[in-house]
Amino acid sequence: KIGATHAGISVGEDGATHQCNEDIALMRTIPGMVILNPADDVEAKACVKAAYEYNGPVYLRFGRLAVPVINDRPDYKFELGKGVVLREGKDVTIVATGLCVSSALEAAEKLAADGIDATIKPIDEELIVAAAKETGKVVTVEEHSVIGGLGSAVCDALAEKCPVPVKKIGVQDVFGESGPAAALLAKYKLDGEGVYEQVKEFCK
């Protein structure tokens, strides 16, 4: 089991040398590797327990920033390889992971969109395909490179069974930079407003 902390650009002032935006892509290529990127402290605890009980390799990705509690509903249940539907919608499906789940939910509230908190590997193909069939459009949101991460995993799942337009929101093909975490998330359009604007443009 591998636990990685301070992932993504939200490490902030530590800068590009400390910002890992490629780790998920690297880990996805390892056979049998399970990748978990919890959205809040509730899910983080559930992920640690699931990793401990799982008989195989697991990569746990933890962010640095404090995030809102999302998974505090009485019916919340974490399962490896299963996404959690946080909001029902009809116009577009937003699939997010890690700290970007809160940004995605903020955008989804304004856009009448589905909101799904996803494990990355194994990806919940059944849930994602069903949601894509319902809305006809999918957006992925992650604090990671748009190359090889959640967006790529979702595209892999949809390509054969439900090819629909997909917008991948994340760090483009660039290195990070130094700055306050909130400012960097805004610059890379990974905060709630940035996600909202990109999804709105995609849905025109």
How does the language model describe each region?
Residues 1-93:
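Conserved thiamine diphosphate
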Residues 11-12, 63-204:
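Thiamine diphosphate
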